[in-house]
């Protein structure tokens, strides 16, 4: 919480929250009985990240979430990291049929062949975008003008619609507007903590 608040010049917010993490209200989606979920909510979700390795990891995980809960994916996150070589982009781009078969037989991750194949083809497109734009965050900024949007209670917006349409045009799969909106929330491009949450910021 401290790093998040200070990174955005919100020292006053940190002072209000300091010492109260154990008691503060959290977003309604956060399962308070799951320590991983609470830590993710408090220290990661909604904090702006611009590095390609993190953005790639989150895009893959969000694509696997389709039809499932984020909590399910988060619980398997370390398994995904192990299975996907810590989401090393070049390594994932080089995955062959043998590696696909290995992933499809790995019961510790989501064994959906379509999603697994999509994650690899999407990785190659992701790498192409990085080469074309300089970074994936620079690509996102083409649609957001580098702004951070503060909004709650939505599942799509104009940004997610446009980014989703462009990624699909480039050949990516499992990147519908709802998934992309969730991705943008996760990486801090859209800040969506509930109004009742202790980390809510009104802009």
Task: For each feature predicted by the language model, list its residue ranges.
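HhH-family (HhH-GPD) DNA N-glycosylase catalytic core used in base-excision repair
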Residues: 16-203
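Single conserved hydrophobic/aromatic residue that forms the stacking wall/gate
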Residues: 1-17
